[in-house]
């Protein structure tokens, strides 16, 4: 697990980011960080489903299913269980995102992340970097994967693959 001090620090970081984006609402599920494998998948499904029913999103972003991080894997599985179109007709599309420090670190055989959908973030890259810098508990110096240089480099790579100056990729 993660220490209470780090959890409190992350809560403050999330609040700063939420304020910067001017989100109307954020949801704190109060589940054990880095320990979602210790709770029933059903518990996670119910919590995510409750939010989906409340928000009724048309577009869902979820972690890539083969992400090496156990929490990301469990969130992806639970979210997929929640977003079946026959139960949630308001959901039009779901896209899996890549997480620079986790998605491509699965060295086992199996499905790898395939960049299939790109969003142009050229106008927002500076803002993305500013937001990433708020997450001091997650960012470190290069060559750490979650460095500012790595984040910019991935955005430029995805941009070059899609005809933009900078992009984010989804599957």
Language model region names:
Residues 29-32, 63, 97:
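Conserved residues at the C-terminal ends of beta-strands
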Residues 38-40, 72-73, 105-109:
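Short, well-ordered secondary-structure micro-motifs
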Residues 1-4, 32-37, 65-70, 136-141:
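Short histidine/acidic/glycine/proline-rich micro-motifs that form metal-
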Residues 8, 73, 145-149:
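An alpha-helix initiation/capping motif
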Residues 45, 76-79, 129, 148:
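Hydrophobic, well-ordered secondary-structure segments
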Residues 1-55, 85-88, 154, 171:
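Active-site rim/loop-helix segments in enzyme catalytic domains that contact anionic ligands
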Residues 13, 17-25, 91-92, 96-171:
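The feature marks non-catalytic terminal segments
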Residues 47-93:
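Active-site adenylate/phosphate-handling loop in enzymes that bind or generate adenylated species
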